[in-house]
Amino acid sequence: MIKLVYVGESDYVALIRRGDVFFAELSEDGNCYIVKNKNGEDIYLSKDEVIIY
């Protein structure tokens, strides 16, 4: 698990906001991080939308 901070634009559809902290897994292809939003749904975030904490 990787701890990261979301620094992208707030996404109300995905229920995530700038400054949210997540524990994430790296996707199989290594191009994005997989996090769970407040509803438990998988959200895929690109590497330029997050900072490793």
Residue map of PLM features:
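Short hydrophobic/aromatic patches at helix-to-coil boundaries
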Residues: 50-53
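Basic/aromatic-rich interaction segments and small domains that mediate binding to polyanionic partners
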Residues: 2-48
